Amino acid sequence: MKILGITGGSGSGKTTLLRAVEQLGGLGLDCDAIYHRLLETDDALVAAIGARFPGTVRDGRVDRPTLAAVVFADPAELAALDALTHEAVAREVRRRLWQSEAPFAAIDAIGLFESGLASLCDETVCVLAPEETRIERLIRRDGISRERALARIRAQKSDEALRAQCGHALWADAPTPEAFQQQCEQFLKGVLMMEETKKFEKEREALLSSPKNGYDRISEADLAAMESYCKEYMKFISDCKMEREAVKWTIEAAEKAGFRELKPGMQLKPGDRVYGNNHNKSVIFAVVGSESLNEGTHICAAHIDSPRLDLKPNPLYEDAGMAYFKTHYYGGIKKYQWTTTPLAIHGVVAKKDGTVVTVTVGEEPGDPIFCVTDLLVHLSADQMRKTLAEGVTGENLRILLGSRPLKDDEGADRVKFAILMLLNEKYGLTEEDFLSAELTMVPAGPAREVGFDRSLIAAYGHDDRVCAYAAFKPLLDLGTPVKTAVCVLADKEEIGSVGISGMQSQYFEMFMEDLCEATGASKRRCFEHSFCLSADVSNAFDPLYAETCDPANNTKINYGTGIFKYTGARGKSGSSDAAAEVMGYVRRIFAKHDVIWQTGELGKVDQGGGGTVACYMANRNIETVDAGVPVLSMHAPREIVSKLDPYMTFKGMKVFYEEN
């Protein structure tokens, strides 16, 4: 620690210089303030003063005005007081210096040299000011008369004596207090502290990890691009609330950008753009690179399914004059969150004649919405005694559809019959058609900006369509990369990546085999040299539930895309656990292209856990690491992300596709 000694007469401006030290991050030690504090806390010192200067201590407290009148009128008396106080003050100064972790400190003392404190200092400076200025300051600051102010000044060292003792002098002749404050800061930076501080800061930056909020790092150009990107993303997430809709949306956008469907037997060359549609439930896109696929590909793999309420095969029924849909929830949800939430119905119905009908109700401004009812608080005594998991059961997640019975009908279930007639009139459906339907209930309404500053986005299905869009979007404008760029948008991740459209299916192998054959490469060699970013969301640190996370190892809002070495639970179970070299590669390319990123894990050890598609890609001998957007309220009907993190995830995916 470098220590600066500050001295000067009363009213010279020493305190201003000391405050400037503190504003630059240093420790300021005001010996006058320390002395006054000791007069209140050091009984031995007070007793010694009372014995040496009778009449100056009353009821155990020093009468400071009386003591000042005595000592400033007689230099010998002042020297006697200094002899009593210097040792106590010096002892307290040493204690505070020893406890401090500041990079530098300053000791402000009129008797800097007499007390021996100057011996602790690397540099010394005297602060000087015109006598008349000092008098005015003392009158204004201490409320004393002009005569007493002058007597105090005359009892102290002359300017010449101070200059002779100190290595530096600072003349406090600035026209305003603000100007003198700037003068003090310039003095400290330019003459004493700056070189040492710069060296210290460089060492800290080189040795310590000091994550910064992304808004303190992002460029103006990226800020503008972020707003544009997020506006487009909000349109996508509002339009695509189930995997079929995301597949249709991305294929249409890709075809406009020159993509065509990959067929067996096709011959491809660098720059060609192809896709594979897997039963309208998952999709893969690729841009062929200049390098052989035997040298590997760069893959971004995300999923486009989200937790929801799926209709049961026989969903429609009536009870107590109201019609309902029975549901079976899909993925991990907190069931109580879905009550009273406005819901829309999305999906398709495959009719007996082979036609497929698309159904969407609840999204347009004039549409009705649907909901799961909840129990009124007045009758909730039993319910409230249950756990959150038990308070609302999965079987009771039933969708209220209507209550108006069919007029002039005397049969049973008149409300149910009326609902079926409406569905038949609009879609040509019968009750039996529900047996071959994929209909799901999702939160109604578009994505919305959150907060007065509009810095956040609330929407259904950020997990994982926020990463799916970030993985897909760069391909639309991608030229011919060195490594072939592949984007996988998979289904069924929320229930284990199983089934024909999940990441564990053979469809990915089939597509990659066709892609390799079309370019004369080996799929096995291709996988061996490929690299995959498993693009999935992470849990953003929420201070309201801080006890579930290790803050030093948890992603945060506005700190960029999150990179995860591993996920899983109970000892990393179900994780691919990326190698150090894999993490190092991602660090390197993100740093090279100014991608703001962070790292973390899913909560405290044994708090819970979760998985991604990373392990299924790694099982194919593809180097894989998780990367994605931090999310608040994950798996809730409305999830929240910041604007900065999705944009940085997009930027990271983009440079990953472009990187060799």
What are the roles of these predicted feature ranges?
Residues 194-660:
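N-terminal hydrophobic/helix-forming segments and targeting peptides
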Residues 94-99, 104-141:
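ATP-dependent NMP and nucleoside kinases share a basic, alpha-helical "lid"
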Residues 6:
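Hydrophobic anchor at the beta1->P-loop junction of P-loop NTPases
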Residues 33-104:
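ATP-dependent small-molecule kinase phosphotransfer cores
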Residues 92-93, 119-120, 140, 144-190:
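Small-molecule kinase domains that catalyze NTP-dependent phosphoryl transfer to phosphate-bearing small molecules
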Residues 9:
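P-loop (Walker A) phosphate-binding loop of NTP-binding proteins
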Residues 12:
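ATP-binding Walker
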Residues 15:
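Walker A/P-loop
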